Amino acid sequence: IRRPPRSTPKPSSAASDVYKRQELITCDISGYSSDGPSREMKAYDMLVQAETGLSSVTGSPREPSRVGVSVCDIAAGMNAHAAILNAIIERKISGKGQAITCSLFDSMAEWMAVPLLHFDYGGKSPKRMGLRHPSIAPYSSFVTKDDKVIVISIQNDREWNKFVVRVLRTPKLLEDKRFSSNIARVRNRKSLEKKIGSYFLSKTSVQLSKLLRQNDIAYGYLNNVEGLSKHSDLRRTTVNTESGPVRIPSPPYRVLGSKNKLKGVPYCGEHTQIVREEFSK
């Protein structure tokens, strides 16, 4: 249950019932930790993105941005789901339930562990760089002759050598000390991206895709939502709703030998009686 401030006493009435029925598992989802100084504050996804510093490392150098999907809501839901499953397993062993609490802030703070550790132990906050990696180069986006955008990722010197010789076809570039190591390439990122960008503008996306794939260079297209909808790797499944069938992305996991079919979306009140009967026992 995602509770607005002051909607229930602390601890919640649901959690208190654990002490009456020891096998009961409850989960309270809130914006901030129930025992923290911000526990009474309202918390919506974008606000938590801002509070946790996520927005400070997202977007272009000119301005911060929100992540395009509600990651704080999703993260809290995933953590709650994992905690409930863990509690179910524990109950099979001990026979006892658990009162679980989970907050959006704590969930996103955990996801921010890497930039947080960079600051706590390195004294530096990561900068916003758009579609660039802060510590690897080249790892950024380039426009092609036919106005497509391709993102490439060169992870080590071996890949860099192959990229220069087989894709850019300018082996003399390997002699340039400005690009002789990843540290040097990051330091001279602007000059590096100018050279690569010039070459990419001379080739179509199809030509570049073929070259990159043939030489096992990591790359991807910068798609929009339409591109995702038409993507050859997108798996879909159909679920029934009150308004009719809807095709949605398939669950990301697959179980060998199972078709992974989803049940229809419950209509309002569909399980009311079942739940009442279960809790009246």
Placement of each model-derived feature along the sequence:
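Aromatic-enriched alpha-helical interface/lid elements that frame and gate functional surfaces
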Residues: 138-215, 219
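Conserved PLP cofactor-binding pocket of PLP-dependent enzymes
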Residues: 213-237
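Short Gly/Pro-enriched turn/cap motifs at secondary-structure boundaries
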Residues: 129-134, 140-141, 187, 243-246, ...
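Active-site-adjacent "lid/gating" segments in soluble enzymes
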Residues: 17-154
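Glycine-centered tight beta-turn/hairpin loop motif at sheet-sheet or coil-to-beta transitions
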Residues: 6, 145-147, 243
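Short, surface-exposed loop/helix-turn segments at secondary-structure junctions
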Residues: 119-127, 231-241
